[in-house]
């Protein structure tokens, strides 16, 4: 039986705990949002198919824990990854400062040609914003990484961010071909994960 999609891409979310990775994932895959979403402990993933120029593209999107104590368990999740979304909270300066550390981790564990995107989430919280988007853009430009501000709560730039990444992956599909065997056999078995209650916008 032939596959029903043109390409399969594996995306991963990384970033500090509480920045809204799970909320972005829920907004994109299910178009839902909740103020009291339970945070991820360990790893979890969702599957979504998008259509680019009439072609079906299947996405396997991994949501990882932001806590330092779980990071060692997450390193293996970079295997076969095509793109990584590094998320920070625009109302939390420390989460933005830690973006550099997350990028260092990506460069250490992910494939050399992995595509990266920096996302400043919770852009709807204008009065509480502390991270200057111009500085964030400047930082991203210095690393030749795409930058976008999003709001999972108001569904701002969520789909645009994912579609942009998909198009970048398609444009660079030839670079991924040496790893196509491993990436095309990604195990879709849902990993064991636990949840703890917290508020994430």
UniProtKB/Swiss-Prot annotation:
SMART domains: RAB, RAN, RAS, RHO
InterPro entries noted in UniProt: P-loop_NTPase, Rab, Small_GTP-bd, Small_GTPase
Residue positions binding GTP: 15-22, 63-67, 121-124
UniProt keyword annotations, A-Z: Cell membrane, GTP-binding, Lipoprotein, Membrane, Methylation, Nucleotide-binding, Prenylation
GO BP annotations listed: hypotonic response; intracellular protein transport
Keyword GTP-binding: yes
A cellular component term, taken from the record's GO annotations: endomembrane system
Domain of life: Eukaryota
One Gene Ontology MF term: GTP binding
Membrane topology: Lipid-anchor
Motif (Effector region): 37-45
Cellular location(s): Cell membrane
Lipidation (S-geranylgeranyl cysteine): 198
Propiece residue ranges: 199-201
Modified residues annotated as Cysteine methyl ester in this record: 198
Pfam families the UniProt entry points to: Ras (PF00071)
Spans through the membrane: none
NCBIfam families documented for this protein: small_GTP (TIGR00231)
Family membership: Belongs to the small GTPase superfamily. Rab family.
Name used for this protein in its record: Ras-related protein RabA
Taxonomic source organism: Dictyostelium discoideum (Social amoeba)
Name of the encoding gene: rabA
